[in-house]
Amino acid sequence: MELLSLQHFAGCVNETFKASLGDGFLDFVLVEATPLPQRRPDAAREPFSLLFLNASPVLFPQQIYQMRHPRVGEVGIFITPIAQNRDGFVYQAIFN
């Protein structure tokens, strides 16, 4: 599999990723895809951050979720809850 990069996600902002959970799926909307400062000159990719919004009132734990998107395909993404706003919970994924 190709190493994921910011370019895989940049065109998907404000689009829904479906996370597999038990017998169903949860909707996570990608609300931000941003580059992070380069830390190592020999890094395999440029680091980046993704922020997802989930409108459920339930806080889901940090873990790897199998996410599906029409263009990105199915990928395992480790997300961590970082905030709550009026629209739901915000989750972050860091790729470095």
Model regions and ranges:
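Anionic-ligand-binding alpha/beta catalytic cores of soluble enzymes and soluble regulatory domains
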Residues: M1-G11
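A glycine-biased structural micro-motif
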Residues: G11-N14, K18
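Short coil-to-beta-strand transition motifs
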Residues: S20-V29, H69-V75
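Conserved hydrophobic positions within beta-strands
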Residues: L30-E32, I79
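Short, conserved beta-turn/loop elements at beta-strand boundaries and strand-helix junctions
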Residues: T34-R39, A83-D87
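Acidic, aromatic-enriched beta-alpha/helix-loop junctions
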Residues: R39-R71
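Short, compact, well-ordered microdomains
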Residues: Q62-N96
